[in-house]
Amino acid sequence: MIRQWPAPAKLNLFLYITGRRPDGYHLLQTLVQFLDYGDSITIKSTNNSKIRLLNPMTSIAQEQNLVIRAARLLQCNCKSMGKIGADIWLEKRLPIGSGLGGGSSDAATTLIALNMQWQCGLNINMLSQLGLSLGADIPVFIYGKAAIAEGIGEHLTPVIPLEKWYLVALPPVKIATKLIFNHPNLPRNRPKRSIQQLFTEPFYNICEPITTKTFPVVEQHLLWLLKYAPSRLTGTGSGVFAEFNTESEARQIRSLTPKWMHSFIAKGVNISPLHRILRKTRIKSEELLLT
């Protein structure tokens, strides 16, 4: 079986840090919404027990690629009869270190797709636990619904924010999350808010001042967007986004972007494009993932 699957981007529409665990992980309150734009993964199931990424990324060792790690983790937890393997092709559109969740989304799509193609029968909670062992951002992609993520990202409350249009700018810099999260001046003690309070306050990313001060090129992109629309950082960066009510408004401003700005336009969606594909093919995500 050969199937192609989307691995969508995400935006953090707001992001706050409410504490820090003894193990160093930060406790968050963040609103995650998907974009109708992202990577694409093609998977061919095999019966030779090998997991192969046939177009490996030169910037990441294959053994460290989250797609390979996710596939091997599922392989170890799949009770399917006989040998199972996969040949995988990854089409990358989301830059590494951009705050758009590309690696986490790739891993989540790999887990969901291979769970189906290998007929492992794991439910959504099992897949989420596997994903969490690889990265805190992965569970929200597995559940596939816009959500308030709390804890280190594993506690999800589905919400329905407005589905706006976004002009996403991609500064030419890769930012490691730990670089920003370990910054001594990063605020880490914001009082936890109720969901109602979170939606009544102006959206804000607590990492934005640290990231823009550390990386002037990110500030340059953000200041340009702010001339035209409400704009913020996603994750710890480097990606920044401006929000619009209509596609035409977003395209009009994109037509004005300077030559040094790389960008794309996408719509915010509250159901992951991966789960929309499952529904369109009449395979409901709940039926696919829940036993």
From Swiss-Prot:
Keywords: ATP-binding, Isoprene biosynthesis, Kinase, Nucleotide-binding, Transferase. Pfam families: GHMP_kinases_N. Its EC number is 2.7.1.148. ATP binds at P95, I96, G97, S98, G99, L100, G101, G102, G103, S104, S105. InterPro entries: GHMP_kinase_C_sf, GHMP_kinase_N_dom, IspE, Ribosomal_Su5_D2-typ_SF, Ribsml_uS5_D2-typ_fold_subgr. Gene3D superfamilies: 3.30.230.10, GHMP kinase, C-terminal domain. The keyword Plastid does not apply. Pathway: Isoprenoid biosynthesis; isopentenyl diphosphate biosynthesis via DXP pathway; isopentenyl diphosphate from 1-deoxy-D-xylulose 5-phosphate: step 3/6. It comes from Baumannia cicadellinicola subsp. Homalodisca coagulata. GO terms for molecular function: 4-(cytidine 5'-diphospho)-2-C-methyl-D-erythritol kinase activity; ATP binding. HAMAP family: IspE (MF_00061). This is 4-diphosphocytidyl-2-C-methyl-D-erythritol kinase. Signal peptide: none annotated. NCBIfam families: ispE. GO terms for biological process: isopentenyl diphosphate biosynthetic process, methylerythritol 4-phosphate pathway; terpenoid biosynthetic process. The keyword Flavoprotein does not apply.
